[in-house]
Amino acid sequence: ALVGMEEPVEFTADAIRTEKLKVLRAITLPDPLADGAVRGQYTQGWLAGERVAGYRQEKDVPPDSRTETYAAVRLGVETRRWAGVPFYLRAGKRLPRRVTEISIIFKKAPHLPFSKTDTEELGSNQLVIRVQPDEGVTLKFGSKVPGSQMEVRDVAMDFLYGESFTESSPEAYE
């Protein structure tokens, strides 16, 4: 909600809550839902070099359980600012990394100052806000490599709270 909300009229809890509610009320689901959502359940396999059980083989889980352990959905936010911009939410158990982050992926510019061949292997520009672990912000973008050659490479600028401050911060959801 914080990413999609408009700027509050004042920096108070009530004003922020009001703007968050506005954006949450503007959320639309894909229609039909199956076209923009996926869900699943992890099965046995390998994780970090170790053999792991599937969800149905876990202790206290019925062998015929249909409980999802992964879900992803593409949402819309019907506001002037966000109309036509997809928001993706993904959550799951036993994924390769335990991470909570917000990734804002920018559209490619219609006109780039570099030729297409110089940039075709570049990733998208991104702003990644890491909530946990390793709280911080990363800005990923393409940058020209110094020198006379026309070469552009993906680079990242990182800010880590733990490296910048000695004071301890509360847990992400405290």
Map each language-model feature to its residues:
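Secretory/organelle targeting and membrane-embedding segments
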Residues: 1-173
